[in-house]
């Protein structure tokens, strides 16, 4: 249905210089073992979001390689993130964010958030799903089965692919469709368009990321 058009942003995530302009909110730390971005927590319960500095338009395909290293924890992607009045996500008029989840789903920003590795709590590990939510608010928009194994059994990396075009959202892992959703623009508020993208983790999760890219989404 969609193919990749022009490349809007590409980052191999292989060295510290690749993320020198990225912004950390909360208690996260980065390292670059094996020429890949390793994200982990500074201390217990130190959840965080690591933001790409670019503001992306609507109509995009987002791809990245993901490898789970240690659980429990949770991995999420924020996208189409901006202030509730259209401000840039880093506008100084917005309240300071420190990695605490309510700041992101019930604060002064709008965003879509895709939880694609939910292993923080026992009930999440017992019945694994990928969840798509829309904020402001804590609106569960779509769910899909999570095919990713526990870190000990992982054959990493896994290729993650997210399509966002107006109200349409589609997510797949290694080419396997996981969930899709069409935002009607009224049930949970207006359709979100341009905004920033960030990786969120909940401690004590450790994970590895590589080859992050954003392309224009072109309808076939």
UniProtKB/Swiss-Prot annotation:
Q: What's the domain of life for this entry? A: Bacteria
Q: Which organism is it from?
A: Bacillus subtilis (strain 168)
Spell out the protein name for this chain: Uncharacterized protein YesU
Q: Which gene encodes it?
A: yesU
Q: Which residues cross the membrane?
A: none
Pfam families xref list: DUF1961
Instruction: Please name the InterPro entries in this protein's record.
Output: ConA-like_dom_sf, DUF1961
């Amino acid at each position: 249905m969609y193919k990749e058009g022009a490349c809007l942003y590409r980052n191999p995530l292989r060295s510290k210089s690749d993320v020198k302009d990225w912004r950390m909110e909360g208690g996260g730390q980065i390292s670059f073992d094996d020429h890949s971005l390793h994200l982990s927590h500074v201390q217990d319960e130190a959840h965080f979001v690591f933001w790409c500095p670019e503001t992306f338009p609507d109509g995009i395909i987002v791809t990245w390689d993901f490898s789970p290293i240690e659980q429990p924890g949770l991995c999420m992607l924020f996208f189409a993130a901006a202030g509730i009045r259209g401000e840039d996500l880093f506008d100084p008029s917005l309240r300071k964010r420190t990695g605490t989840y309510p700041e992101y789903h019930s604060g002064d920003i709008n965003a879509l958030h895709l939880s694609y590795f939910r292993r923080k709590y026992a009930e999440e590990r017992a019945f694994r799903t990928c969840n798509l939510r829309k904020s402001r608010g804590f609106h569960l928009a779509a769910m899909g089965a999570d095919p990713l194994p526990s870190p000990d059994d992982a054959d990493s990396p896994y290729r993650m692919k997210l399509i966002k075009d107006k109200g349409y959202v589609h997510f797949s892992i290694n080419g396997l469709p996981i969930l899709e959703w069409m935002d009607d623009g009224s049930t949970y508020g207006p359709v979100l368009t341009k905004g920033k993208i960030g990786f969120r983790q909940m401690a004590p999760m450790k994970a590895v990321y590589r080859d992050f890219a954003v392309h224009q989404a072109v309808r076939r």
